[in-house]
Amino acid sequence: MDRPFSPSSERNRAPIEQILKRAFAARQNVLEIGSGTGQHACYFSEALPHLRWQCSDRAENLPGIRSWRAHAQRPNMPEPIELDVNQPIWPSSRFDGVFTANTLHIMAWEEVQQLFARLPEVLAPQASLVVYGPFK
């Protein structure tokens, strides 16, 4: 399978990395919500090797993420998990960091509300949340 490619992910990864280095300096286990192509995960898991970078997305995006993961061969990037904010099943694990990029502005408002309502289920105490994207 060809790896999906997002030009914007390539352009914004370095500036985001600078923020993540500070925000996740003392973190170990990060959940990325809406991993999309998987490009960010591959880049950040290499740039921040102290983090276990858990990708998640809707089922239809998982093959592309798996393709990037297979290409990158990162030991700190486990198999991506299915996560749809509208579905009742969320990860049972707790994460001390959550990251999402370019998701909230494409979600329906009800989905954004659902995301923030459900986040406490996966956040460890004192966890960090980093959201990147355009806002109105």
PLM-predicted stretches and their roles:
Residues 90-98:
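A short acidic, Gly/Pro-enriched loop at the edge of an enzyme's catalytic core
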Residues 27-36:
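Conserved class I S-adenosyl-L-methionine
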Residues 113-125:
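A short glycine-rich, Lys/Arg-flanked "PGG" loop and its adjoining helix->strand segment in the class I
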Residues 1-25:
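Class I SAM-dependent methyltransferase Rossmann-like catalytic core
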Residues 100-103, 109-112:
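A short beta-strand submotif of the Rossmann-like class I SAM-dependent methyltransferase core
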Residues 31, 42-88:
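Class I SAM-dependent methyltransferase SAM/SAH-binding core
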Residues 126-134:
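Conserved beta-strand signature within the Rossmann-like core of class I S-adenosyl-L-methionine
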